[in-house]
């Protein structure tokens, strides 16, 4: 018989119970589900203008850091100017790896809405994959569809939603 520790379902923290330092079960599931796909750069794309995209990305990044440690970086590309997109793309895709850079590193990139900041389009297109960020009850279906069309629906691994405030 195995000596492995057994965990009963009732011993696990509930989804809505605050368990200090541990992200929600749904975020953990999202993180591990996107790990099944191959990517080294993943961009979070707000589906509409003026969205608090960091409210979506920071908790997901926290889960990723717990799982991957220093092998995950967060790149804040909000308000990036078109003249700065090329160096940013080089940084996020790892085209220029300096001495001491690690293999297996992944980058989570945050951009502003491509509807209000077109300079985010080349960044989104350069990433291996994307996640669509949607605020429930606030994001318009038209804006979400337009965002999918601009970036390319096939690039998206899924969608992160925030409930109504």
Language-model-detected regions and their locations in the chain:
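P-loop NTP-binding module
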Residues: 1-165
